[in-house]
């Protein structure tokens, strides 16, 4: 089987979608499934060594220098001239130009098409279109989602809570819950001491970590305010924020306004295969409070290094932050959260606690998830072939 992935984002753009695509493609290859990836070009990026990654000329995105948008003409030519006879199934990963191009391509060439719902737009659209009232933005996001989910044969949701949210919208397309899982590189033990030396962080000061996109929807404002409260109890604490994004300037100003800038370090993106494991290993507590995660892989990445996690449990993260995980799950309230961080710092040296966290992360190994994805593809392909031969009714075209 050969599967076409279509995505509006991929590396060097760092986010959860890029990570998910790379992880699944690597594991699917081990299982004998070939994938082709069509994604935008990024100016100045190094050429891909992998010939199965097909870059399409792109343009900029207003007010978003990190992202690119496909140019329609080149995208259509790539799909129709290079790929029409080469794929058995189309898998869409983003809801922008990639979605409409992927659906059109699949229909024109008689191919089954599925999509992964990676991004929960409802709660952060207003950050990027601030003139839009939040109530109207949510209505638009829901209608947009409902329409797109009806375009495909089946959907993949990274978590059960995300599936429940989609079904509450009125989505009737079948939804398979299938997390990405952690790739093997996440379990390579990091060198925390090396990371502290690299970034001139004292070895004896407790270190809080946030890793991820520095974006408004990640609710890092709350983490900074919580940290200001924590410093009253633990004035020796440091907070490292690893990542980049549109909220960086705002958060830098906020740290100054709170008077905590000397204890907060913004260090940018880290290399996933070298520096990032070391970063997690250096931490005494990983803190997270995003309200919009469809899964929350960074929580598992931290656990894989045995780093204590303190997090709210919103949307997709609820699937990870179970009672067995060993994580501290707290409400989005500064005092309660900071108290949990104090407790996590006390338990950070506990070897049994770290072992519990690692064991939980290991239960999310990505190869097992890839096997489930292969079964999903086979199921969808079989149902589609039955529809084509008239032995099974098409729920999309019939309106069921």
Where is each model-derived feature located?
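Short alpha-helical donor nucleotide-sugar binding micro-motif in glycosyltransferases
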Residues: 269, 277-283
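Carbohydrate-associated surface elements
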Residues: 41, 161, 181
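A short helix/loop element that forms part of the nucleotide-sugar donor recognition site in Leloir-type
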Residues: 188-201
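Short hydrophobic beta-strand element within catalytic cores of glycosyltransferases
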Residues: 308-311
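Conserved acidic donor-binding segment of nucleotide-sugar-dependent glycosyltransferases
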Residues: 323-335, 343-349
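Aromatic "clamp/platform" in nucleotide-sugar-dependent glycosyltransferases that forms part
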Residues: 291
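N-terminal subdomain of nucleotide-sugar transferases
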Residues: 1-57, 367, 374, 378, ...
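Nucleotide-activated donor-binding/catalytic signature segment of Leloir-type glycosyltransferases, i.e.
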Residues: 252-270
């Amino acid at each position: 089987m050969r599967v076409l992935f279509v995505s509006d984002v991929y590396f060097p753009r760092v986010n959860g979608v890029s990570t998910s695509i790379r992880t699944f493609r690597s594991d699917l290859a081990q299982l004998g499934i070939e994938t082709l990836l069509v994604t935008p070009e990024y100016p100045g990026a190094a050429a891909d060594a992998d010939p199965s990654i097909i870059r399409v000329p792109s343009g900029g995105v207003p007010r978003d220098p990190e992202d690119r948008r496909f140019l329609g003409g080149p995208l259509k030519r790539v799909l129709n001239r290079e790929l029409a006879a080469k794929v058995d199934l189309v898998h869409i990963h983003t809801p922008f130009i990639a979605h409409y191009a992927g659906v059109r391509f699949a229909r024109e060439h008689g191919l089954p098409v599925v999509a992964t719902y990676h991004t929960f737009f409802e709660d952060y659209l207003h950050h990027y279109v601030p003139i839009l009232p939040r109530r109207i933005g949510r209505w638009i996001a829901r209608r947009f989602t409902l329409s797109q989910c009806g375009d495909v044969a089946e959907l993949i949701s990274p978590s059960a809570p995300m599936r429940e949210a989609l079904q509450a919208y009125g989505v009737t397309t079948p939804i398979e819950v299938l997390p990405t899982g952690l790739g093997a590189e996440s379990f390579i033990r990091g060198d925390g001491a090396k990371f502290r030396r690299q970034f001139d962080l004292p070895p004896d000061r407790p270190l809080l970590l946030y890793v991820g996109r520095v974006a408004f929807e990640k609710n890092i404002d709350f983490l900074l305010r919580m940290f200001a409260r924590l410093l009253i109890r633990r004035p020796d604490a440091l907070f490292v924020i690893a990542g980049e994004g549109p909220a960086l300037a705002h958060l830098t100003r906020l740290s100054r306004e709170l008077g905590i800038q000397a204890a907060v370090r913004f260090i940018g993106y880290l290399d996933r295969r070298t520096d990032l494991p070391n970063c997690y290993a250096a931490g005494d507590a990983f803190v997270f409070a995003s309200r919009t995660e469809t899964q929350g892989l960074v929580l598992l990445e931290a656990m894989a290094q045995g780093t204590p996690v303190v997090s709210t449990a919103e949307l997709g993260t609820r699937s990870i932050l179970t009672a067995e995980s060993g994580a501290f799950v707290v409400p989005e309230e500064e005092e309660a959260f900071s108290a949990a961080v104090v407790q996590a710092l006390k338990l950070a040296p506990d070897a049994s606690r770290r072992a519990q966290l690692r064991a939980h992360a290991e239960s999310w190994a990505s190869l097992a998830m890839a096997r489930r994805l292969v079964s999903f593809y086979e199921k969808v392909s079989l149902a589609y072939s039955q529809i084509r031969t008239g032995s099974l009714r098409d729920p999309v075209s019939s309106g069921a």
